[in-house]
């Protein structure tokens, strides 16, 4: 019993998991790969699909914006609730199920309001599963290495992110732009993702057993989302400032086409190449973090500076290089940047931390997108100066962070 007599503690590691940590991470990564085929495939045609039902540009912008806000902002709710219930598998399965069900239905939605609701519901599914999923993964990553575990998961995710849009594009070409079969075929990878996830839950019902540290059991009272370590908040500040100076691919692609650097048909090809850079850099940064520690993250602000120096020129080679650098930065953001949270926050409050971190990351990304877009309209030279200033501030803040890193076994 705990000191107050109402919270039981147990030492994790008393029961050996049925799967090795690396196998758990790999299988979880395959689940993410299959799920990415589903929702990245759907997201690649969300705009045209809504337009086919009569949506205006404003409607598309509002619906997709609300969806992304829900995907990140609702984690402030789902994270603490997952910590309170300790039912991380249930939250993860529920979130994936919502995504797998809504995407095929989107293809047969006969009314605009139904399609809009399904687009938002799919993003809510990501909010439901996000903190719980990252918490489950963080336990196994304590053995593989935080950086390596999250990096392998992200690399597999990106394979799915490339396969999904290509699958949908192929189906549209075969069926003459029929959305129902193009999205209906995604039922197959979606069903496989859920089946594999349920199998993984049965094999490793308590992934926290990978960690050799005390953990709260039972049904503890809800952790206060704001009662998190000071170093965690400093890390959130570093992340926010970094993202304020990071442009979106939407703006990069706008520049490519509006300045006549690339034909519109070539933009998806460049994006696919950026996703390949994402996967490779995620692996490299993850392994580097486990070996060298926090200084690995110094690369992220530097990459953000290189993006604006290269991607907003009128030279096709420079723009392509800048886009590949953008993909590399995203790879670090989606892997190592998330993995560090687990080294800063103990298991009982980790889902809450992931919820807060994701919400802050989303707000900073949205703010950064608006800031970069506004500066782009004013002057590219001004944009470069402001981004350099922001990223230098982020570097200073990063070196003030003390990370109690857990070495891989």
From Swiss-Prot:
It comes from Mycobacterium bovis (strain ATCC BAA-935 / AF2122/97). PANTHER family: BLR5212 PROTEIN (PTHR42688:SF1), CONSERVED PROTEIN (PTHR42688). It is found in: Cell membrane. SUPFAM superfamilies: MFS general substrate transporter. One of its GO terms (cellular component) is plasma membrane. The chain crosses the membrane at residues 18-38, 47-67, 100-120, 159-179, 180-200, 232-252, 260-280, 302-322, 355-375, 380-400. Keywords: Cell membrane, Membrane, Transmembrane, Transmembrane helix. This is Uncharacterized protein Mb2288. It is a multi-pass membrane protein. It holds the Pfam family MFS_1. GO terms for molecular function: transmembrane transporter activity. It comes from the Bacteria.
């Amino acid at each position: 019993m705990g000191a107050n007599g109402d919270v039981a503690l147990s030492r994790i590691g008393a029961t050996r998991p049925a799967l090795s940590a690396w196998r758990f991470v790999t299988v979880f990564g395959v689940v993410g790969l299959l799920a990415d085929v589903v929702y990245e495939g759907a997201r690649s045609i969300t705009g045209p699909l809504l337009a086919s039902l009569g949506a205006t540009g404003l409607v598309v912008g509002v619906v997709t914006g609300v969806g992304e806000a829900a995907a990140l902002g609702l984690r402030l709710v789902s994270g603490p609730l997952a910590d309170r219930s300790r039912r991380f598998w249930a939250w993860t399965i529920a979130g994936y199920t919502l995504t797998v069900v809504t995407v095929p239905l989107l293809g047969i939605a006969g009314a605009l309001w139904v399609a809009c609701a399904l687009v938002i519901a799919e993003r809510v599914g990501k909010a439901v599963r996000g903190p719980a999923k990252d918490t489950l993964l963080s336990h196994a990553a304590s053995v593989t290495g935080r950086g390596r575990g999250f990096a392998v998961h992200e690399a597999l995710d990106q394979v799915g992110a490339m396969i999904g849009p290509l699958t949908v594009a192929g189906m549209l070409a075969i069926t003459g732009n029929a959305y129902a079969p193009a999205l209906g075929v995604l039922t197959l990878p979606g069903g496989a993702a859920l089946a594999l996830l349920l199998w993984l839950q049965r094999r490793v019902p308590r992934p926290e057993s990978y960690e050799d540290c005390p953990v709260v059991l039972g049904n503890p009272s809800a952790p206060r989302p704001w009662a998190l370590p000071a170093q965690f908040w400093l890390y959130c500040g570093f992340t926010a400032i970094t993202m304020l100076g990071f442009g979106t691919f939407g703006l990069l692609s706008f520049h490519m086409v509006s300045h006549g650097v690339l034909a519109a048909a070539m933009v998806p090809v460049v994006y696919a190449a950026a996703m390949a850079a994402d996967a490779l850099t995620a692996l490299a940064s993850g392994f580097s973090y486990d070996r060298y520690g926090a200084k690995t993250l110094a690369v992220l602000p530097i990459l953000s500076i290189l993006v604006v120096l290269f991607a907003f020129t009128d030279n096709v080679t420079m723009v392509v290089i800048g886009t590949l650098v953008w993909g590399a930065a995203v790879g670090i953001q989606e892997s190592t940047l998330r993995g560090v949270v687990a080294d800063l926050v103990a298991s009982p409050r980790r889902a809450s931390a992931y919820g807060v971190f994701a919400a802050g990351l989303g707000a900073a990304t949205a703010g950064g997108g608006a800031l970069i877009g506004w500066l782009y309209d004013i002057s590219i030279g001004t944009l470069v100066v402001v981004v350099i200033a922001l990223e230098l501030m982020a570097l200073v803040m990063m070196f003030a962070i003390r990370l109690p890193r857990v070495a891989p076994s």
